[in-house]
């Protein structure tokens, strides 16, 4: 994925996370329980487009936030 696309996707994840009432710490903790080795700092970097997001992370975020892929990728 290109940098601009990942940045936009990160913005979408941040917005969805806030709407669903999760902090970055809470989201990273739920992702860790789901098997992803991720920190709050990594979530923050994903949200601002400074870290690549992997397919398994996208899938887990989708499940935790209970959203469609369309909402993440729009």
Language model region names:
Residues 11, 21-22, 38, 53-56:
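Residue-level signal for the short linker/turn that defines the boundary of a DNA-recognition helix
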Residues 1-20:
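A short, Lys/Arg-rich alpha-helix, primarily the initiator
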Residues 50, 54-71:
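DNA major-groove recognition helix of helix-turn-helix/homeodomain DNA-binding modules
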Residues 21-45:
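Short alpha-helical DNA-recognition segment
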Residues 12, 42-45, 71:
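Residue-level recognition of specific faces of alpha-helices
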Residues 18, 32-33, 48-50, 59:
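Residue-level detection of the helix-turn-helix DNA-binding "recognition helix"
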